[in-house]
């Protein structure tokens, strides 16, 4: 039996028994599976809610436990903690990829290891716990699973994500607005590719491609940093 058919193992792993098991099934259903089966709910709406719940819990924790840090410092730390890479690492620790329902095509192209799919599933899982058990239980789940990430971030042991790093480089010269613009997207809903450019006014700094908007923006920022480093070498 595939693990997504029996979620008792996952419930034991996260030490949470769901009252409404349907919420957990939806949280672990990728859009590609829903497209194949029709009339099946998938996890994008839960992902939307889970992102906000995660932001709230981490923000509250940092606010209450790091009273010596300024708003700006806390915002930077939160950006390090609540990012796609962190969510991916949580998903890997929970072996979440084994439980996700997805299309055969998605699975054959590496969907169970894809960063964006796993990160989104963690956010959806957080939302499902929140809806089923409330804020206290989901807070405990988040702080338990993100504890090491929070500790490393506060000890400056996590490398900045590319968007944050680019922002810090650019804003050394003042409060300059950086814009991420989605140029286009292509492909079926379960395998959509996003193209993003990062600009300052009319100056394009870099382009990025990814299987989520977040991933394409991070790759655009990474390319912008690389381009800036190359230009420095030839100045």
Swiss-Prot record:
Matching entries from CDD domains are given as: DSRM_RNAse_III_family, RIBOc
* Cysteines paired by S-S bonds: none
Instruction: Specify the DRBM domain's residue ranges.
Output: 161-230
The segment(s) forming the RNase III domain are 7-134
The superkingdom listed in its UniProt entry is Bacteria
- Cross-referenced Pfam families: dsrm, Ribonucleas_3_3
Cite the EC number.
3.1.26.3
State the coiled-coil residue ranges: none
- Single GO term (MF): metal ion binding
User: Catalytic center at which residues?
Assistant: 51, 123
EC class (word)? hydrolase
Task: Write the protein's name.
Answer: Ribonuclease 3
Query: What organism is this sequence from?
Result: Clostridium tetani (strain Massachusetts / E88)
As recorded in Swiss-Prot or TrEMBL, the protein's gene is named: rnc
């Amino acid at each position: 039996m595939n693990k997504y058919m029996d979620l008792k193992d996952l419930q034991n792993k996260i030490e949470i028994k769901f009252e409404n098991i349907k919420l957990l099934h939806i949280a672990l259903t990728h859009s590609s599976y829903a497209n194949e089966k029709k009339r099946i709910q998938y996890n994008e709406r839960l992902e939307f809610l889970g992102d906000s719940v995660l932001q709230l819990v981490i923000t509250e924790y940092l606010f209450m436990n790091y009273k010596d840090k300024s708003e700006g410092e806390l915002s930077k730390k939160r950006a390090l903690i609540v990012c796609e890479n962190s969510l991916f690492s949580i998903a890997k620790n929970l072996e979440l990829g084994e439980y996700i329902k997805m299309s055969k095509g998605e699975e054959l192209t590496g969907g169970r290891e894809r960063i964006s799919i796993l990160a989104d599933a963690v956010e959806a899982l957080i939302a499902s716990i929140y809806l089923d058990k409330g804020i206290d239980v989901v807070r405990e789940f988040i702080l338990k699973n993100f504890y090491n990430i929070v500790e490393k971030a506060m000890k400056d042991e996590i490398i900045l994500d590319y968007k944050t790093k680019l922002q810090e480089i650019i804003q050394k010269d003042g409060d300059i607005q950086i814009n991420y613009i989605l140029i286009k997207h292509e492909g079926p809903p379960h395998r959509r590719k996003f193209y993003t450019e990062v600009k300052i006014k009319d100056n394009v700094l870099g382009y990025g491609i990814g299987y989520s908007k977040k991933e394409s923006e991070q790759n655009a920022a990474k390319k912008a940093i690389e381009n800036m480093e190359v230009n420095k070498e030839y100045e």
